[in-house]
C-alpha cells in the first residue's frame, strides 16, 4: 500500500481540484504560446489570415466565393439593411474595409469583394485589368449576386472602377462614394514625383521598400510585426510582374474618372484625407467641378490620415458613409 502524503490528507478536496485545474490551464497556455510563437516564426501568413477572419466575424461578415465569367470572386457579405458595395484600391484587398465594416454592418447589408486579380479572387494570366475591364467584371458580379439597387463606394483605383460602372449602369446605383479617388486632374503628389523619377513604390522586395510605401499611404504608418511585413514582401515579390503590368495600364489612364464625371447622375460623395500623398487633395476640386449632372454632391475631408481613411480613421469614415447613405 502506497504511503499517503500529508498534503493529500490535509488539503481540502476543492483545493486539490483547483490546483489540478490550474496546472492543466497552465499547460494549455504554454502549449498555445508555443503554437502561436511557432506560427509567427514559420507561418505568419496563417496568423494574419486568422486575424482578418476574426475581424470579419466580429463585423458579422461571412466569406463567400462565386465563379462569374473568367473570375472566381472572393467576397465578404453580411449585415442587414440597404446594400452597400465596397471596392478596394490598387494592390489592395477586401480586408482593408474590415474596420469600417464593423461599424456599418449593424445598419447595412455589405458586399465587399476582392477585385479580380487581387486578394483571394482569381487572376487570368496576361488578362486585362484596366478600368473598363474591371467595370465590366463588376457588372457581371453584381448580376450574378442579383443585388438590388445599392450604394457603391470605391477607394483609389476602386473609385475609378465604381464610377465607370455607375456611369454605365446608373439605374443600379443609388449613390456613389469616391474615397481618395484615382483618375482626376490633380496637383503633383509624392507618388507621381517618385514614378516620374523611375521609382514605383508599389514594387518592393524587402522591409525597407514596404516602409517606403507605408510612409506614402499612411499619415501614421501602422507598427506591423516584422514577420507580417515579410508576408507582404513575399506576396509583392510573387505578384511583381502583375503589379507592374497593371500599374502601367492604369498609369496610361490618368483621367479614367475625370472623363466620366459628366455622366454620373446619382448623388455623389467625394471623401479625401487631407494629407494624401498618393493622390493630391486638389483632385477634390476637379471632382466637384466636373459633376455637372449629379443629382446631389457632397464632399468631406478628414484630417490626420494619408491615402487610407478606412484604416486610419474608420470611425469618421463610417460616420460620413452612413450619413451619405441614409440621406439618399
Annotate each PLM feature.
Residues 76-120:
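Conserved HGGG/HGGXW glycine-rich cap/lid loop of the alpha/beta-hydrolase fold
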Residues 294-328:
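Catalytic active-site module of serine/aspartate enzymes centered on a nucleophile-bearing elbow/loop
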Residues 264, 270-272, 276:
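Short beta-strand/loop motif that positions the catalytic acidic residue
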Residues 45-47, 54, 187-193, 203-263:
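Conserved alpha/beta-hydrolase catalytic His-Asp/Glu region
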Residues 163, 167, 174-205:
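Flexible "cap/lid" loop of the alpha/beta hydrolase fold
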Residues 1-82, 107-108, 148, 326-328:
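Alpha/beta-hydrolase fold catalytic core
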Residues 277-283:
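Conserved alpha/beta-hydrolase "acid-adjacent" motif
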Residues 68-69, 74-78, 112-153:
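Active-site loop/oxyanion-hole signature of alpha/beta-hydrolase fold enzymes
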Amino acid at each position: 500500500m502506497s504511503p499517503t502524503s500529508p498534503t493529500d490528507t490535509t488539503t481540502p478536496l476543492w483545493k486539490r481540484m483547483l490546483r489540478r485545474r490550474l496546472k492543466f490551464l497552465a499547460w494549455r497556455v504554454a502549449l498555445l504560446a508555443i503554437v502561436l510563437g511557432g506560427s509567427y516564426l514559420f507561418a505568419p501568413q496563417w496568423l494574419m489570415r486568422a486575424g482578418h477572419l476574426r475581424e470579419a466575424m466580429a463585423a458579422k461578415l461571412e466569406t463567400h466565393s462565386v465563379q462569374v465569367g473568367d473570375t472566381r470572386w472572393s467576397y465578404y457579405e453580411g449585415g442587414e439593411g440597404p446594400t452597400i458595395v465596397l471596392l478596394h484600391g490598387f494592390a489592395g484587398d477586401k480586408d482593408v474595409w474590415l474596420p469600417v465594416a464593423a461599424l456599418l454592418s449593424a445598419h447595412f447589408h455589405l458586399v465587399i469583394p476582392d477585385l479580380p486579380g487581387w486578394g483571394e479572387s482569381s487572376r487570368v494570366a496576361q488578362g486585362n485589368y484596366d478600368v473598363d475591364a474591371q467595370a465590366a467584371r463588376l457588372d457581371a458580379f453584381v448580376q450574378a449576386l442579383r443585388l438590388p439597387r445599392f450604394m457603391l463606394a470605391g477607394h483609389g483605383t476602386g473609385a475609378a472602377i465604381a464610377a465607370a460602372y455607375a456611369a454605365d449602369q446608373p439605374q443600379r446605383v443609388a449613390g456613389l462614394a469616391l474615397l481618395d479617388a484615382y483618375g482626376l486632374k490633380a496637383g503633383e503628389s509624392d507618388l507621381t514625383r517618385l514614378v516620374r523619377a523611375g521609382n514605383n513604390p508599389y514594387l518592393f522586395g524587402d522591409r525597407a521598400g514596404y516602409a517606403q510605401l507605408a510612409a506614402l499611404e499612411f499619415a501614421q504608418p501602422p507598427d506591423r510585426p516584422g514577420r507580417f511585413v515579410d508576408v507582404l514582401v513575399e506576396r509583392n515579390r510573387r505578384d511583381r510582374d502583375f503589379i507592374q503590368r497593371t500599374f502601367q495600364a492604369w498609369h496610361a489612364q490618368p483621367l479614367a474618372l475625370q472623363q466620366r464625371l459628366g455622366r454620373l447622375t446619382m448623388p455623389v460623395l467625394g471623401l479625401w484625407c487631407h494629407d494624401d500623398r498618393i493622390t493630391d487633395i486638389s483632385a477634390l476640386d476637379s471632382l466637384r467641378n466636373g459633376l455637372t449632372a449629379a443629382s446631389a454632391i457632397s464632399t468631406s475631408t478628414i484630417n490626420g490620415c494619408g491615402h487610407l481613411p478606412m484604416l486610419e480613421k474608420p470611425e469618421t469614415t463610417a460616420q460620413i458613409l452612413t450619413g451619405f447613405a441614409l440621406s439618399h
